[in-house]
């Protein structure tokens, strides 16, 4: 796109605090945004061809609350992303991320994280440090197992649909706020689903269709009645 068009977007963003430039074929993060590091609350550069984020620039958006880079070509995130201390929403669906920076747990204000359609092979342990995270979408990755560290997650909703999960730690039942757990279209045998999810957790919506067992078999497990009590109580609350 032309420089004059980009300038117009930058000028508008100076007034609104919102910079949105989607579907423009951008191959890099616009350097002109360095003029707006103290203005911007929202950046949306989805549906472009951006391969990397400039480390020195990205960490300067200290007032940023929402960052969306869905449908780009990102392979790594710079450590400097951890400087975004006010960031509440981070959306990076459909990129090529295999891991997250070790500093990721320092995004202390983060509430919503979307990483669907990447190449994560494991549940990143850094996510367990995010105390205010409410919703996390890790669907359509390559995660094979859920480790013990999952018990420290603070999320209310966890989407792990369409991974390759065949093992889940019993610690998932210890998540203090987890209400919605989505595990559809994975590789789970019924024997690998911790019974404590049904009997001893806060989970009131468990979605497990498309695994290696029939749903009616789930209803025969000990603890299913307790799960249904929670499910029904929640339904009534929102009816």
Curated annotation (Swiss-Prot):
The gene is LRRC57. It is a lipid-anchor. LRR repeats lie at residues 39-60, 63-84, 86-107, 109-131, 132-153, 154-175, 177-197, 202-222. Its main location: membrane. One of its GO terms (cellular component) is extracellular exosome. Keywords: Leucine-rich repeat, Lipoprotein, Membrane, Myristate, Repeat. The keyword ATP-binding does not apply. SMART domains: LRR_BAC, LRR_TYP. Gene3D superfamilies: Ribonuclease Inhibitor (3.80.10.10). A lipid is attached at residue 2 (N-myristoyl glycine). InterPro entries: Leu-rich_rpt (IPR001611), Leu-rich_rpt_typical-subtyp (IPR003591), LRR_dom_sf (IPR032675), LRR_domain-containing (IPR050216), LRR_R13L4/SHOC2-like (IPR055414). It is found in: Membrane. This is Leucine-rich repeat-containing protein 57. Coiled coil: none annotated.
């Amino acid at each position: 796109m032309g420089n004059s068009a980009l300038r117009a977007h930058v000028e508008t963003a100076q007034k609104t605090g919102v910079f949105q430039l989607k579907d423009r074929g951008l191959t890099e993060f616009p350097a002109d945004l360095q003029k707006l590091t103290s203005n911007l609350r929202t950046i949306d550069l989805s549906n472009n061809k951006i391969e990397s984020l400039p480390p020195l620039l990205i960490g300067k958006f200290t007032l940023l609350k929402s960052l969306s880079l869905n449908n780009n070509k990102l392979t790594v995130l710079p450590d400097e992303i951890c400087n975004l201390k006010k960031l509440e929403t981070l959306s990076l669906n459909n990129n090529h991320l295999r891991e997250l920076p070790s500093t990721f747990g320092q995004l202390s204000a983060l509430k919503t994280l979307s990483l669907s359609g990447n190449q994560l092979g494991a549940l990143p342990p850094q996510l367990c440090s995010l105390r205010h995270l409410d919703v996390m979408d890790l669907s359509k990755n390559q995660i094979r197992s859920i480790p013990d560290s999952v018990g420290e997650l603070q999320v209310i909703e966890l989407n792990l649909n369409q991974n390759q999960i065949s093992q889940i730690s019993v610690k998932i039942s210890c998540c203090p706020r987890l209400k919605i757990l989505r595990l559809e279209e994975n590789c789970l045998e019924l024997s690998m689903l911790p019974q404590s999810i049904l009997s001893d957790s806060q989970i009131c919506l468990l979605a497990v269709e498309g695994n290696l067992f029939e749903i009616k078999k789930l209803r025969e497990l000990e603890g299913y009645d307790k799960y249904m009590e929670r499910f029904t109580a929640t339904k009534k609350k929102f009816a």
